[in-house]
Amino acid sequence: MKKNRAFLKWAGGKYPLLDDIKRHLPKGECLVEPFVGAGSVFLNTDFSRYILADINSDLISLYNIVKMRTDEYVQAARELFVPETNCAEVYYQFREEFNKSQDPFRRAVLFLYLNRYGYNGLCRYNLRGEFNVPFGRYKKPYFPEAELYHFAEKAQNAFFYCESYADSMARADDASVVYCDPPYAPLSATANFTAYHTNSFTLEQQAHLAEIAEGLVERHIPVLISNHDTMLTREWYQRAKLHVVKVRRSISSNGGTRKKVDELLALYKPGVVSPAKK
């Protein structure tokens, strides 16, 4: 089956893991994603409805605009994907405009440009909340028109929310399945390149996420979580059924260090969850 690509480039995107995720994702009527990111899982599954959330307000605003004003958005965004805009001077002008703009539609248009023309498809903000990714110097950035239209079509059955993982997981009902793709736990104390946006995800939040998953499965709502395979993640997910997968990093802070690392898919499923350890 042909895989559908997201219209955004995204650090930690789940496109390479789709087959593994779909293999272990339980069936249900509604998919809840508290960390939707670029939406690769949403775009490649067939639930009748979706609840998609992220803490990044720019991302959720963009998705709602693409959903509701598709043609207008595609036309406006296409105008920025021309040879004249592919230079550092224009990029930094657009980046400054994005950071100063209060217009949601214009910000959404600029967000796609910055995503495709910026370095490595990163989405990163400084402590003042300003987008600060440098110019990427790509020969000819791709305008994802087909991907935008496919996203907009699928989005008619989706609701997008800018909120915390706890709030979006609270929306799950007995017809729901939850897939969580949190910012990954660091492989080591010095390897935390996973702070992709201003909100760093703490170890306490990682453990809290697992606690919420345990609570949901007690209500017969299955949860699948992806993360690095470390001693900590195995401790957090000790009540889940663990599946180990290898994935090649698609975005790296050092282009020469893209290698396969072990990742975990932790499945909390009624009847499969281990009893709590005393």
Curated annotation (Swiss-Prot):
Organism encoding this protein: Escherichia coli (strain K12)
Q: Can you cite a GO biological process for this protein?
A: DNA restriction-modification system
Q: Does the keyword S-adenosyl-L-methionine apply?
A: yes
Q: Which family does it belong to?
A: Belongs to the N(4)/N(6)-methyltransferase family.
Judged by the first EC level, this protein's enzyme class is: transferase
Question: Has keyword Nucleotide-binding?
Answer: no
Q: What is this protein called?
A: DNA adenine methylase
Q: Which GO terms describe its molecular function?
A: S-adenosyl-L-methionine binding; sequence-specific DNA binding; site-specific DNA-methyltransferase (adenine-specific) activity
User: Phenotype of the disruptant?
Assistant: Cells are filamented, accumulate DNA double-strand breaks, have viability defects at 15 ng/ml ciprofoxacin. A double deletion with priB is seriously disadvantageous to cells.
InterPro entries membership:
Ade_MeTrfase_dom_2, DNA_methylase_N6_adenine_CS, M_m6A_EcoRV, MeTrfase_D12, SAM-dependent_MTases_sf
Q: Which Pfam families match?
A: MethyltransfD12
Catalytic activity annotated for this protein?
Answer: a 2'-deoxyadenosine in DNA + S-adenosyl-L-methionine = an N(6)-methyl-2'-deoxyadenosine in DNA + S-adenosyl-L-homocysteine + H(+)
Its Enzyme Commission number(s) read 2.1.1.72
State the protein's purpose. Answer: Although it shares sequence specificity with a number of type II restriction endonucleases and methylases, it is thought to act in methyl-directed mismatch repair, initiation of chromosome replication and gene expression. Genetic interactions among priB, dam, lexA, nagC, polA, rdgB, rdgB, rep and uup link the PriA-PriB replication restart pathway to DNA double-strand break repair.
| Keywords per UniProt | DNA replication, DNA-binding, Methyltransferase, S-adenosyl-L-methionine, Transferase
**Gene (name only):** dam
UniProt-annotated binding residues for S-adenosyl-L-methionine: W10, K14, D54, D181
